[in-house]
A protein has these predicted regions:
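Boundary/entry segment of secreted carbohydrate-active catalytic domains
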Residues: 2-24
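Acidic/histidine-rich catalytic cores of soluble enzymes
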Residues: 8-9, 25, 29-32, 38-39, ...
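Active-site beta-loop-alpha junctions enriched in small/polar residues
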Residues: 15-19, 42-46, 70-73, 109-111, ...
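Residue-identity detector for threonine
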Residues: 18-19, 78, 103, 159-160
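Conserved phosphate-coordination/catalytic loops
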Residues: 18, 22, 83, 87, ...
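Generic detector of intrinsically disordered, low-complexity, polar/charged segments
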Residues: 1, 22-27, 64, 106, ...
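Structural motif corresponding to the early beta-alpha repeats
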Residues: 37-140
Length: 184
């Protein structure tokens, strides 16, 4: 397939979770060795090595961050728990900015009780609480709908249309939707 789109890897990004057993360094070096210029990082791997080391490894290998997973996880039973989740999203936005990443992937959070409508409202309220901070740091918020089988524990946002509806209601160009073909 000479000259085909498959020869151009300039827009291909590796989701770090596909190499979850690797350290951040191993994943970034693996991208570099494979000719990939982009990686989607996971926060747990950033935290394992620290933000400064992550930045160094990325720079040393010429690999850029396409997105950081995961922010979100907004629904909670108490106001204090919701605020703790919002505060964690502020830290995630800071991590994006420090790694020159313009997109925080939001896995919105599962069902803390039996009130699906309230959980979805808390998702929108949570995004609204962080959007101005994201704008100030030039970080986009990408709402990722997950397959409905994950509604109980990972995300009460299960469809593309639900994601688009939330983004539209928030009304900021900084809020959009990211899709993982596994979930749609």
């Amino acid at each position: 397939m000479e000259g085909s789109a498959f020869q151009d890897l300039s827009r291909l990004s590796l989701n770090q979770y596909t190499t979850h057993a690797w350290s951040l360094r191993e994943a970034v070096e693996g991208c570099n060795n494979a000719g990939l210029q982009w990686i989607g990082l996971w926060r747990d791997k950033i935290q394992e090595c620290g933000i400064d080391e992550a930045r160094r490894v990325l720079q040393d290998n010429g690999v850029r961050v396409s997105g950081i997973c995961r922010g979100g996880w907004f629904p909670a039973l108490t106001a204090a728990e919701r605020q703790a989740k919002i505060d964690d999203n502020f830290r995630a936005i800071d991590e994006c900015a420090q790694l020159n990443c313009d997109t925080l992937i939001l896995v919105c959070g599962g069902l803390p009780d039996h009130d699906l409508a309230e959980a979805r409202k808390q998702v929108q309220d949570g995004i609204e609480a962080i959007v101005d901070y994201a704008v100030g740091h030039n970080v986009r918020l990408g709402i990722e709908p997950l397959h409905p089988m994950f509604a109980a524990d990972r995300s009460v946002i299960s469809t593309t249309s639900q994601s688009l509806d939330i983004a539209e209601r928030i009304g900021s160009p900084q809020v959009g939707v990211v899709l993982d073909v596994y979930h749609i």
